[in-house]
A protein has these predicted regions:
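Flexible, glycine/small-residue-enriched loop-and-beta-strand segment within the central core
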Residues: 41-50, 58, 70-78, 83-142
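Terminal amphipathic alpha-helical/low-complexity segments used for targeting or macromolecular assembly
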Residues: 1-57, 61-63, 102, 116-118, ...
Length: 142
């Protein structure tokens, strides 16, 4: 039987402190292994979770990967062997966003299928513009 959900005020401080300590130890172990094997240090979630598994869960093409820190919204399709870097935003909430095969979307890139600049500068008189975005095969974005 699942435990009853408690408010943050009701959480056991000893339990939370132990959990925090356990996570710190895990973070140190993961970071040490990354540095040893690949000479890199990543944000905890990016280091902890598998990029290829996440891409598969999102329905991206075979062999593609997406960092845990990347944000994916709306209708986004990604082809095979495509790399989506850390801190990327793929926002297909305005229309479809399609990225081809063998592409690299570099760290921090933001791709949107909508534009709200006219809505803002017109003080709401103009609507946001929405349009599909398609990035072809073999493209580097960065």
């Amino acid at each position: 039987m699942p435990s009853e959900r408690r408010s943050p005020d009701e959480l056991d401080c000893d339990y939370m402190n132990q959990l925090h300590n356990d996570l710190r130890v895990l973070r140190a172990v993961v970071d040490e292994e990354l540095r040893r094997r690949w000479d890199r240090s990543l944000p905890f979630a990016d280091a902890l979770f598998d990029r290829w598994e996440r891409a598969d869960q999102l329905g991206f093409g075979e062999g593609s990967s997406v960092y845990d820190s990347a944000h994916v919204f709306g209708s986004v399709a990604v082809g095979e062997e495509t790399w989506i870097g850390p801190f990327v935003i793929l926002d297909g909430s305005g229309a479809a966003l399609t990225i081809g095969n063998y592409c690299d979307v570099s760290a921090g890139v933001h791709i949107f299928t909508h534009d709200t600049a006219l809505r803002c500068v017109s003080m709401g008189q103009a609507a946001a513009r929405r349009s599909p975005v398609s990035i072809g095969d073999g493209t580097y974005v960065g």
